[in-house]
Amino acid sequence: MMLSWKQLILLSFIGCLAGELLLQGPVFIKEPSNSIFPVDSEDKKITLNCEARGNPSPHYRWQLNGSDIDTSLDHRYKLNGGNLIVINPNRNWDTGSYQCFATNSLGTIVSREAKLQFAYLENFKTRMRSTVSVREGQGVVLLCGPPPHSGELSYAWVFNEYPSFVEEDSRRFVSQETGHLYIAKVEPSDVGNYTCVVTSTVTNTRVLGSPTPLVLRSDGVMGEYEPKIEVQFPETLPAAKGSTVRLECFALGNPVPQINWRRSDGMPFPNKIKLRKFNGMLEIQNFQQEDTGSYECIAENSRGKNVARGRLTYYAKPYWLQLLRDVEIAVEDSLYWECRASGKPKPSYRWLKNGDALVLEERIQIENGALTITNLNVTDSGMFQCIAENKHGLIYSSAELKVVASAPDFSRNPMKKMVQVQVGSLVILDCKPRASPRALSFWKKGDMMVREQARVSFLNDGGLKIMNVTKADAGTYTCTAENQFGKANGTTHLVVTEPTRIILAPSNMDVAVGESVILPCQVQHDPLLDIMFAWYFNGALTDFKKDGSHFEKVGGSSSGDLMIRNIQLKHSGKYVCMVQTGVDSVSSAAELIVRGSPGPPENVKVDEITDTTAQLSWTEGTDSHSPVISYAVQARTPFSVGWQSVRTVPEVIDGKTHTATVVELNPWVEYEFRIVASNKIGGGEPSLPSEKVRTEEAAPEIAPSEVSGGGGSRSELVITWDPVPEELQNGGGFGYVVAFRPLGVTTWIQTVVTSPDNPRYVFRNESIVPFSPYEVKVGVYNNKGEGPFSPVTTVFSAEEEPTVAPSHISAHSLSSSEIEVSWNTIPWKLSNGHLLGYEVRYWNNGGEEESSRKVKVAGNQTSAVLRGLKSNLAYYTAVRAYNSAGAGPFSATVNATTKKTPPSQPPGNVVWNATDTKVLLNWEQVKAMENESEVTGYKVFYRTSSQNNVHVLNTNKTSAELLLPIKEDYIIEVKATTDGGDGTSSEQIRIPRITSMDARGSTSAISNIHPLSGYMSVLLFFIVNALW
């Protein structure tokens, strides 16, 4: 079809405008929705939303019930953008269906219909309601009769006074369909006034009707009668897809009927069906087509039953299966536009263009909802809407049709500047300019026209295909495209390269865990091409940064060798080297088998258990590419430290055996078992533990150890032992058999200790002789029988305290603070046990016996030294023996007086003189005071300054002569000696090592020490009889 010059100018203008501004028809962002407005609302306006995008920006208008709303004339309506605001809404004028129209230069679209309704609830008429009189046991219905209203209501009833509401149960029911109150069987407690309460669910307004008095008749009680269904659902009830359906059913009767529900076809109810209000209501949520059918309500009591039936039918508003999409198409082409919707009943279709019904003509036809327009022209452009509707609703789908006319243009889809291919391949050179209608294309290589031949062909979309490319095909190709509105051309340079080849490919390898390998991948390629290597492991691209601890790419520019370090089992698999250039790609694969220690065996089970054996079975785990050679069994109990190897039959379990018997188990112990597999590489991870099992019981085999005893109280024989560990008790009911007899008697006395943890038994009998020997043995038993006894050992009965006192007690003073006490031991036969020692009690002349102090000596000692005593004072003392049972009687009392204290005056004016061989000491005589011991002599204490070993020289003179052969300083002290001990020490004298021929000093001039010379030795002129 030829277009006029005016159309060409218009097309040209539209094309430029479209390129600059990207024009777009209106598309709704927000559409109005159904709205219910409370009449008594404090908000005095309603806003209906409408917003669309488009370029240029759309403008808006509205219709009410198909008539335009003129906002310039009616000031109750205002536009805010696309939103319509209704001021002071009136239910008489503003109720109806609203639609929004959005328009720009490309067309108009119409919104969905939005219904505006007004909700209100008027008051009940003020009139008295008649009294309802019934017999006790009779059913009754109290009518509500709601006042005029609009909008959904809910119902309740007040009993006597507000807000005491009637509680619904199996006897009382409030219908939310009619508002009536149903009482299945009236009782005396029901007498009173009943008021219907109606609430608007929209406005939340509540109104109360007039009270209805309910009284009991006095002419008797109603007898029993079968149920009478008063509340039932319609015989046919349409239900919308996705809605919530509620069916009510309630019956009067005496006794109170029970309500049950079922489907007539016997199918069970799905979980989404709920029974509410004591079965008086059946609720189906999210109603779907499979929920249709006949439902039955059965009311039943002891007098009979009645059934109400109704059928639920399914309907669905239209919903889209296929929406319209914007179409841009060239002039003179044909359009086939399909919109598809579903619903029940099946929807019908109609089309709008720019908000008006589409006018059909020879070119424009609608069939089954699909729109066909042939021989398109620019005037067909606009906004189209498909409407699908049935009696339950309608839906809109909108799209823009752009009919374009333009000369070929490569600006939006330019040809590639260069195409690289390899020798022998196939190449397609694209030529796809934007053109309406589609352009015709022809090709040139350089200045020569390209003609079709065996290897060269032209494609329908204008492209050029060349097969089995050769080097001669390289060059510059130009495509010229032309239609009735003009022509344009584009150029592509074709580069032909040599193919890439892998000259050193990876090969299959077999390695052990921990090794490192290199998989080679070296290529030969066209030098004009850049090359890139990639490695795939089991189909996944190797990330050398993430997996750098194991994988590294090595080699030169033409090499992509893969190094794998410290190979693990997880690295087994297929490796592919992928080599890619700008024109081709090649690859080579290799299998890498990694052999390692086997994986853990699986499904470890205990098939049979006895008292000392367990039959095990398991299945083989992964062999890590190295066959399993052997298996080992390990066990664990609550008493073991970790897992322990156990003996099995067979003793060596080869890799093909998956059963074994564990032997030498302890009876009545809970065991877990696991299996460890080994191959040439080494031992693998152990299996998961088996379930815990307990071996069967057996008679005990281990006797208690460390059987001994002794001690205890008078007339007792105490026997002790180490308890048998739980893991060696071999069964439940474990205890001990204790056997004993006096030494020399043949008959055993036996008793039982039932506690397995008890380590002792005490036998009490007044006839037991103290510290008499008994033969003792301890055996074991459990539910399965008795076990062995321990070896016989001798245990002594309990001791008694000694009955005699030590004899020949004597005491004498050793010094001013010490007295020695001595005695004779008591005979063994009179000790009544093993004698532990003696206790010495003592007190001074001025003290009381009750305040005496004690000293104990162990064993058979026959003397003790009392220390820390006061000087020149008489002390009294007595001795008694003791054993483990206690102490015996004290001996007779003896006494001794401590000696006087040593002199408190130290030796004074100690003077020393030294020659080359001698040191002479002199000091003043010490005189004792009247209360001090007389001086009997003196002690000279001396040592080298570098040692603590002190030597003592006794003398009865006030002088001493020494040879000092050691080349060290000496420290010297002098003390007086008496019967009462040593006196106070003189001041220390330091004699320096001798370095000169003559030296002297004294305690009064110790600081003036002269150095001594020569080799020093000590010559003792008196007998050394003590060390200090």
Swiss-Prot record:
Residue ranges of domain Ig-like C2-type in the record: 32-117, 122-209, 227-313, 318-402, 408-497, 499-593
Record-linked InterPro entries: FN3_dom, FN3_sf, Ig-like_dom, Ig-like_dom_sf, Ig-like_fold, Ig_I-set, Ig_sub, Ig_sub2
Entry GO CC: plasma membrane; side of membrane
Keywords: Cell adhesion, Cell membrane, Disulfide bond, Glycoprotein, GPI-anchor, Immunoglobulin domain, Lipoprotein, Membrane, Repeat, Signal
Glycan-modified residues: 65, 193, 377, 468, 489, 765, 860, 895, 913, 931, 956
Keyword Lyase included in the entry's annotation: no
Major localisation: membrane
CDD domains: FN3
Region spans: Disordered: 684-714
Membrane topology: Lipid-anchor; GPI-anchor
Propeptide boundaries: 1003-1028
Disulphide bond pairs: 50-100, 144-196, 249-297, 339-386, 431-479, 521-577
Coiled coil ranges: none
UniProt record, GO biological process: cell adhesion
Compartments where located: Cell membrane
Record lipid sites (GPI-anchor amidated serine): 1002
Residue ranges annotated for the Fibronectin type-III domain, each copy included: 600-698, 703-800, 805-901, 902-998
Signal peptide stretch: 1-19
Pfam families for the chain: fn3 (PF00041), I-set (PF07679), Ig_3 (PF13927)
Tissue-specificity statement: Specifically expressed in brain. Ectopically expressed in tumors expressing endogenous intracisternal A-type particles (IAPs).
Family: Belongs to the immunoglobulin superfamily. Contactin family.
Quaternary structure and interacting proteins, as annotated: Interacts with PTPRG.
Role according to the record: Contactins mediate cell surface interactions during nervous system development. Has some neurite outgrowth-promoting activity.
UniProt protein name: Contactin-3
The organism's taxonomic lineage, starting at the top: Eukaryota, Metazoa, Chordata, Craniata, Vertebrata
